[in-house]
Amino acid sequence: MLKKSLLSKECREISLAGVHHVVLRGFNYERVFNDEQDRRKFLEILHQITHPMDENGDPLPPYCTIYAYCLMTNHIHILLAEGTEQMSDTVERISEAYINY
């Protein structure tokens, strides 16, 4: 079972448009999602990344903008643009939130 580790490859090209294709894979290409609940949790995490709130519940600027995503059994595709933090920090935030779920 995955959820112990999500791996992403380092960016190989700099996007002049600021839009990046990110691929997250399961460790050793293992399953990322075991059931519908796992998929829903991942989508909830994406929503939290694009609609963050402070400790008082007030909205904060988004960490990124997500244009598209595709949840596969053993990997995930995300098309995103940087927001208030660097892409690598956002990808790490997404990965850690799902791993800790």
Residue ranges with predicted function:
Residues 1-101:
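Short catalytic/metal-binding and nucleic-acid-binding patches
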